[in-house]
Design a protein with these regions (language model features):
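Catalytic NTP-binding/metal-coordinating core of nucleotidyl cyclase/transferase enzymes
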Residues: 1-68, 75
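Catalytic beta-strand-to-alpha-helix segment of the class III nucleotidyl cyclase homology domain
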Residues: 58-169
Length: 169
């Protein structure tokens, strides 16, 4: 199955658990991950699963995936800026297109691994994508692509050409 995989992660959630305690922090994180999943589904994605403070979503169309994560990043970043500094959890997002295998509602494959690694590697409030995810994406106001170059991704022999999706309006 050819698809675009989106992996999101909340940066700084460990400190929020320390500040708020388990119950309140869990509620806060769950509200955000639920919202991310809903936004992706509304944009045409399929929620595969949430994993703690992360969300894994598949999109049939890479432009839909990129548009969705740009809107999510804009809305979430605005919310982060209104939060007290010790409760800020900016989002990191990795996007990768490629082949995946579906097994019992879960997805496996290179694109899943690359999206997860890009999510780990990018900075807070950033979106990183592989070349396959952005090669048909239309840039416009508030959505530009900046090539970061070939980046070595753990577990892969070949470096991966990575783009940063600039989403600031």
């Amino acid at each position: 199955l050819q698809t675009t995989v989106v992996f999101t992660d909340l940066h700084g959630s460990t400190a929020v658990f320390e500040a708020l305690g388990n119950a309140l922090a869990t509620q806060t994180v769950t509200q955000i991950t639920t919202w991310v999943g809903q936004q992706c589904v509304l944009a045409g994605g399929r929620l595969v699963k949430t994993l703690g403070d992360g969300v894994l979503v598949m999109f049939a169309d890479s432009q839909d995936a990129v548009n969705a994560v740009v809107e999510i990043q804009r809305a979430h970043s605005a919310r982060v800026m209104r939060s007290p500094p010790n409760l800020r959890m900016p989002m990191r997002i990795g996007v990768a297109s490629g082949e995946v295998e579906m097994v019992a509602g879960d997805c496996y494959g290179d694109a899943v691994n690359v999206a997860a690694r890009l999510c780990d590697l990018c900075g807070p409030s950033q979106i990183w994508a592989n070349a396959a995810a952005v090669n048909t994406v239309h840039e416009g106001p508030g959505l530009t692509l900046r090539v970061l170059g070939p980046i070595t991704i753990r577990g892969r022999a070949e470096p991966c050409t990575v783009y940063q999706i600039e989403w600031h309006e």
